[in-house]
Amino acid sequence: MIDTVLFDMGGTLEDIWVDDESRHSSIQGVLDILRAHGIDLNMDFETTAQSINAGWERYGAYRDPRQRELKPEEIWGSFVLTDFGLNEDSVRPYAEELAHMWEITHYHRTLRPHVKEMLEGLKGLGMKLGVISNTASLYQVFDVLKDYGIRDYFQDVTLSSVTGYRKPDPNIFLVSLHQVQSDPASCAYVGDTLSRDVIGPIRMGFGATFHIDSYLTKLKDTNVPADVKPTYSVKDIYAVSYTHLT
């Protein structure tokens, strides 16, 4: 019997996408934060953007094979801003400011239609609810959930930036399961990527998995084994609330 439903954040509870406007705004955001802290890079915008993007690629090359998440000062001080002579100690005072800004600026984010109605329906069934999210910011997910007006629906919010583990690593799921005090077999997981949100819960023995497409799905779901299938595929997240889970 399913008594707990856990959700991915970006691409699942919210629509998320990147375009030229958001790419430009996020680079400008980095420059603005650095200048506010007395650091002027004295470099043209295009070269700055190339260096920052190369830094993110370096971090991705470290992070993805290990399924690990570093803290903001490590990400920005040891990967993203190293071309500018900055390091963990120098960026530590404003690393989370950079991380938070990047998450809400590099990505356009809007709450998916029918999320509140779906959460209300699950609450009405007595379900425990939680979020498990890969994120490079310590606080952004909490703040955005509050901005959407849905923070209070969730008994737990587990983040890779806090645990140090990224989906599909089993440890991030285990942290959430301990927080909500549920067994894997009694949990359903809802996400937009097979490579993280379906493979991870299947390996953990979750009772059900839901998959919903997003902008990120094709970007992240490369080289996924053909036999990896969710229990349910949905087009409208509201379907989670009326699928027969019990």
List PLM regions with ranges:
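Active-site neighborhood of HAD-like aspartate-dependent phosphohydrolases
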Residues: 1-49
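A metal-dependent, Asp-based hydrolase signature
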Residues: 45-99
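Substrate-recognition/cap helix-loop segment adjacent to the acidic, metal-dependent catalytic center
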Residues: 123-130, 135-158
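Acidic, Mg2+-coordinating phosphoryl-transfer loop and its flanking beta/alpha structural elements
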Residues: 188-229
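Conserved small/polar residues in nucleotide/adenosyl-binding loops
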Residues: 243-246
